[in-house]
Amino acid sequence: MRIGLFTDTYFPQVSGVATSIRTLKTELEKLGHTVFIFTTTDKDVNRYEDWQIIRIPSVPFFAFKDRRVAYRGFSHALEIARQYQLDIIHTQTEFSLGLLGIWIAKELRIPVVHTYHTQYEDYVHYIAKGMVIRPSMVKYIVRGFMSDLDGVICPSEIV
């Protein structure tokens, strides 16, 4: 299969999600699959890194400056996904690249699955001191994101 992984967090950013995605990519390739990573730009990345990593223009997220959010290049990402003839999209975020992955899957009429990595209820207090999104709102937002997916993976029972 030709698999597109869509994530807002990938190396050189340091996180459990980035490590999980790299491990997933490695193991899928060992099984004979071709894996493309669609992720955000990063100033610390060599412009000529692995050709299977597609960087989408991004800016720092206001609440977490070390995390990034894509803001343009969506049509170009669709062209690349079409050119690479993806069979399935696997999103790894509920934010910019996750939404992009869902849109591209619909445009290409291919399945989209999602890994739910983060228990957001534990993080909303960092965004405008919890005044914008309350922990009780998270489940409704997440359900909305996941309503049209073909599958959801949770790496732990807590999440």
Please give the residue ranges for each predicted region.
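N-terminal subdomain of nucleotide-sugar transferases
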Residues: M1-P57, A81
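Active-site proximal beta-strand in glycosyltransferases
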Residues: I3, I88, A105-V124, I153
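Alpha-helix capping/helix-boundary segments
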Residues: K43, S96, I158-V159
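An amphipathic, basic-hydrophobic alpha-helix
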Residues: F62-I88, L97-W103, E107, S136, ...
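Nucleotide-sugar donor phosphate/pyrophosphate-binding loop at the beta->alpha transition
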Residues: P111, D122-G144
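A short, active-site helix/loop in glycosyltransferases that binds the activated sugar's phosphate group
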Residues: F145-V159
